């Protein structure tokens, strides 16, 4: 396959960054050419306004990194070395109902829930924590096998989705925590990095950068 054919094939499949290698033969000599290129989304992203509906009290000392509603209960992950924690919060009053301090060697980041578990990321420590949702008992830990850092995290019924500070969104097996594949978060003219906390709703992932949403599918470049 030559570079032009490979590029056309990539464009037909998806957006993102691609690395294509081509081998050239001249007699007994073999030459290898590597070419990296980017494919952007076809359309500009939509820009939304918002309306502030209500405000709630919140601990001003909490260095919030992740938020997760389960029914009417708010779970929160706070960061900073020495003050990281996992919390259960009454969002109406701001009262912390349950708090698990994290070892000072970890800076905790995004959280999500999957079935009866809470999953919490660390920033640069290459480890994630799995807790019992009701008791906050630590059930398991896991390593990031491909991504360099832990930033945002969310889930649907089948997978976890994670960001790492780059423009990549990782799809993760919730049983093994293997990073299965990634998609690049792309607009019509830019790759969006530093995408942080995530929430999944109605088939879309809402991501905190300003605030954007993207399809979890690596082949859907329309969102």
PLM-predicted stretches and their roles:
Residues 90-93, 132-135, 174-176:
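Short loop/turn segments that connect beta-strands within beta-propeller blades
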Residues 96-123, 127-128, 138-144:
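Blade-loop segments of beta-propeller domains
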Residues 10-16:
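Surface-exposed, short loops/turns at beta-strand junctions within beta-sandwich domains
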Residues 34-49, 82-87:
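Blade/loop signatures of beta-propeller domains
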Residues 213-220:
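Conserved small/polar residues in nucleotide/adenosyl-binding loops
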Residues 76-80, 120-126, 162-166, 207-211:
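Conserved beta-strand positions in repeat-built beta-propeller and related beta-rich domains
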């Amino acid at each position: 396959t030559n570079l032009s054919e490979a590029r056309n094939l990539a464009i037909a499949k998806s957006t993102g960054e691609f690395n294509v290698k081509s081998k050239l033969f001249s007699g007994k000599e073999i030459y290898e050419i590597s070419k990296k290129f980017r494919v952007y989304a076809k359309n500009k992203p939509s820009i939304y306004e918002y309306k502030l509906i209500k405000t709630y009290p919140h601990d001003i000392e909490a260095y919030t990194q992740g938020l997760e509603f389960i029914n009417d209960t708010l779970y929160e992950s706070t960061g900073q070395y020495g003050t990281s924690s996992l919390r259960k919060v009454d969002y109406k009053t701001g009262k912390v109902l349950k708090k698990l301090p994290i070892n000072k060697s970890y800076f905790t980041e995004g959280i999500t829930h999957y079935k009866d578990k809470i999953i919490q990321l660390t920033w640069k420590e290459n480890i994630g924590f799995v807790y019992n949702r009701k008791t906050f008992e630590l059930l398991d830990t896991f390593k990031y096998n491909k991504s360099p850092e832990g930033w945002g995290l969310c889930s649907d019924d089948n997978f976890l989705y994670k960001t790492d500070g780059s423009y990549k969104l990782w799809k993760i097996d919730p049983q093994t925590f293997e990073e299965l594949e990634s998609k690049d978060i792309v607009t019509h003219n830019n790759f969006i990095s530093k995408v942080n906390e995530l929430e999944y709703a109605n088939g879309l992932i809402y991501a905190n950068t300003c605030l954007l949403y993207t399809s979890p599918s690596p082949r859907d470049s329309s969102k």
